[in-house]
Amino acid sequence: MKQLLDFLPLVIFFAVYKFFDIYIASGALIAATALQLVVTYALYKKLEKMHLITFAMVTVFGTLTLVFHDDAFIKWKVTIIYALFALALGVSQLLNKSILKSMLGKEMKVADNIWAHVTWYWVSFFAICGLVNIYVAFSLPLETWVNFKVFGLTALTLINTVITVFYLYKHLPEDQRKELK
């Protein structure tokens, strides 16, 4: 259920864009992201920092898109969010306080160097996605960027999540691997 809620704003953005335009879709994205926060809090009685940061970015860049009637702001939002994720992961790793380990370390007992590999992998992934977003957003038609944002980045994130799970599984202690089978 939680993962479905994460996709709600993206689905609404895409649908509204297809029926209207980027400006109405940007307004719908702000509203859908706010709704996501309300529903998530109502169901789980807590909000994750990632959701709050995303909501803040969506609100700021969506509002700028609407006020200035310029889709460049909503396009930059994607890159800035990915840059913030890469920065947060990278800094946490440099401080030996891996965010990924703190999120998943209780369920997956792997060595610190494995968490470091996974963290730097995701730092690289987010940085590359942010750069590719800039290229697609400002070199290709708007329709292409919307499809890339909704389908391309989502697919890439899911693929990288699966790769990460397999990598972590490979490095789990044998007794923990047996528990997961």
UniProtKB/Swiss-Prot annotation:
UniProt keyword Cell inner membrane present: yes
Query: What keywords appear on the UniProt entry?
Result: Cell inner membrane, Cell membrane, Membrane, Transmembrane, Transmembrane helix
List the InterPro entries hit by this protein, alphabetically.
YciB (IPR006008)
Topologically, how does it sit relative to the membrane?
A: Multi-pass membrane protein
Q: According to the UniProt entry, where is the signal peptide?
A: none
Just give the chief location class.
membrane
Q: What family does the Swiss-Prot or TrEMBL record give for this protein?
A: Belongs to the YciB family.
Task: Name the chain's protein.
Answer: Inner membrane-spanning protein YciB
Q: Which organism is it from?
A: Shewanella oneidensis (strain ATCC 700550 / JCM 31522 / CIP 106686 / LMG 19005 / NCIMB 14063 / MR-1)
Question: Which lineage is the organism of this entry classified under, starting from the top rank?
Answer: Bacteria, Pseudomonadati, Pseudomonadota, Gammaproteobacteria, Alteromonadales
Corresponding gene?
yciB
